[in-house]
C-alpha cells in the first residue's frame, strides 16, 4: 500500500500526514511548492518513504511558464542535493527515444545524474508503448539508465545546458 501527499506547503503538513498514515502504508510526499522547497533541511529528516518533485505543479506554484525551468535553473538539482541518501524522483519516463516535447533520453540523463531512484510514466508512454512489448521496453530503459550512469561517472557529463536552452 502507498499513499501520496500532493502540494504540501510546510513540514508541519507533512508531519500531520505521516502521523495520520502511521506507517500503515508507504508514503510519497510531492514537492510542488516553493514554500516546501525552502524547508528542505527540516523536510529531509522526516520519516517519509519517497519524495517526488512535481515539475508541473512546481512551475504553476512558482509563477513560471515552462515546466523545464526547474531543471534548467538548478531548482531540481538543489532539491535533489538535499535529499541524498533518500528515495526521490522527478520527471517522467517513457520508451527510449520517445517523449514529447523533450525526448525521454534527456530526462533520463538528468535523473541519473541527480541520483533519482524512482520515476512515473509520462503521458506519452501510454501511446508509445501500444505496439511494443512492455517487458522489452522496460529492459531497454533499465539498460539505458545503467549505461548513462557509467558515462556520467566517467565523464561528469551533463545535459543541464540543454534544459537551459529549452526554457528560452
Cite the ranges covered by each PLM segment.
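Non-cysteine beta-strand/loop elements that form the S-adenosyl-L-methionine
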Residues: 6, 49-57, 121
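Acidic (Asp/Glu)-rich catalytic clusters
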Residues: 18-22, 42-47, 81-85, 111-113
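A short, flexible beta-alpha/helix-coil linker loop
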Residues: 57-60, 95
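Conserved active-site loop/cleft motifs that coordinate metal ions or position small ligands
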Residues: 89-91, 118-123
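Catalytic cores of alpha/beta
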Residues: 1, 13, 34-47, 94-117
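Active-site-adjacent beta->alpha loops and helix N-cap segments on the catalytic face
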Residues: 5-25, 35-41, 60-80, 100, ...
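Short beta-strand/loop segments at the ligand-binding rim of alpha/beta enzyme cores
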Residues: 21-32, 82-97
Amino acid at each position: 500500500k502507498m499513499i501520496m501527499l500532493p502540494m504540501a506547503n510546510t513540514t508541519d503538513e507533512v508531519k500531520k500526514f505521516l502521523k495520520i498514515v502511521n506507517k500503515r502504508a508507504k508514503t510519497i510526499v510531492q514537492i510542488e511548492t516553493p514554500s516546501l522547497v525552502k524547508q528542505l533541511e527540516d523536510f529531509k529528516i522526516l520519516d517519509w518513504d519517497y519524495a517526488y518533485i512535481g515539475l508541473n505543479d512546481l512551475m504553476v506554484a512558482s509563477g513560471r511558464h515552462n515546466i523545464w525551468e526547474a531543471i534548467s535553473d538548478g531548482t531540481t538539482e538543489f532539491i535533489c542535493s538535499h535529499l541524498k541518501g533518500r528515495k526521490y524522483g522527478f520527471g517522467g519516463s517513457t520508451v527510449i527515444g520517445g517523449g514529447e516535447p523533450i525526448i525521454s533520453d534527456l530526462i533520463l540523463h538528468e535523473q541519473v545524474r541527480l541520483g533519482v531512484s524512482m520515476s512515473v510514466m509520462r503521458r506519452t508512454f501510454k501511446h508509445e508503448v501500444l505496439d511494443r512489448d512492455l517487458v522489452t521496453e522496460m529492459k531497454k530503459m533499465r539498460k539505458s539508465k545503467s549505461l548513462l550512469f557509467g558515462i556520467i561517472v566517467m565523464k561528469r557529463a551533463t545535459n543541464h545546458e540543454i534544459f537551459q536552452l529549452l526554457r528560452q
